[in-house]
Design a protein with these regions (language model features):
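Binuclear metal-dependent hydrolase catalytic cores
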Residues: 1-180, 184, 189, 246-265
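Binuclear metal-ion centers of metallo-dependent hydrolases, dominated by the metallo-beta-lactamase
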Residues: 143, 187-265
Length: 265
């Protein structure tokens, strides 16, 4: 039995390049600078098959799942309701049709209210519509663990409450790997949930400060505090060139890029 996490997207809300072919400080010749919006795929692999857990459905999710060869999914978890993490939700329809059943999606209460309002037809068949609802809404009660079952065996994730500007968001810990995009602060209780990590994938939006996201400097300070064995910086804006950022980081910290994979037992 083993686990694999694939970073399907590692960019900030506008991606890299931004519309208008704006690469900022990023070198267009380096494919690791082309970043779709943030999402991750967690797989548990055993002799019986695979269990797949998707984290977020950004606007790029269709191409991300095509690139990853994903045809079915056992469950989707949401970090929060912002557009760059949710507005590909309708593409779950195709997965539901492939599986001939609804897709289970896990959300905290603010995200549930938001998505069931904005995308109500995904959860409830609209009057006079011929399109069936395709999603089951399941509650996240952080920090209570949630479990997604599939052919490869159960994936258990601990939701970690995060500060994200005026709103909140969730990170997720699976074993000794944690995925924490869109974080601007951590309460003491959440800090305790992030100790003893082998790998921490963490938000590092820009060099300069931002009210809702860690900067590179803030992320490095938190890495120094929590002491994961390795760390990966994600949710990267156009001012963070991959090669330039890599040169500045300590040996156990690397920038993320779309398609990066980590495995563990």
């Amino acid at each position: 039995m083993s686990y694999k996490l694939t970073l399907l997207g590692t960019g900030s809300s506008g991606g890299v390049p931004r519309l208008g072919n704006n690469w900022g400080a990023c070198d267009p010749a380096n494919p690791k600078n082309r970043r779709r919006r943030c999402s991750a795929l967690v797989e548990r692999i055993s002799g019986r098959g695979r269990t797949l857990m998707l984290i977020d459905t950004p606007p790029d999710i269709r191409n991300q799942l095509l690139d990853a060869g994903v045809e079915t999914i056992d469950g989707v978890v949401y970090t929060h309701d912002h557009a760059d993490h949710t507005h590909g939700i309708d593409d779950l329809r195709r997965l539901a049709f492939n599986m001939k059943r609804r897709v289970d999606v896990y959300m905290d209460e603010p995200t549930r209210i938001s998505l069931e309002t904005r995308f109500s037809y995904c959860f409830r068949m609209a009057p006079h519509s011929t399109y069936p609802a395709v999603l089951n809404s399941l509650a996240i009660d952080a920090p209570q663990p949630l479990t997604i079952n599939g052919a490869g065996g159960p994936i258990t994730a601990i939701p970690i409450p995060q500060m994200h500007g005026d709103a909140g968001s969730l990170g997720f810990r699976i074993g000794d790997v944690a995925y924490c995009p869109d974080v601007g602060g951590l309460a003491p209780e959440s800090v305790e949930l992030l100790r003893g990590l082998d790998v921490w994938i963490v938000d590092a939006l820009r060099y300069i400060s931002h009210p809702a996201h860690f900067s590179v400097g803030q992320a490095l300070k938190w890495i120094e505090t929590l002491k994961p064995k390795r760390a990966i910086l994600t949710h990267l804006h156009i001012d963070l060139d991959y090669a330039a950022l890599q040169r500045e980081l300590p040996p156990h910290v690397v920038p993320a890029f779309d398609g990066l994979q980590i495995t563990w037992a």
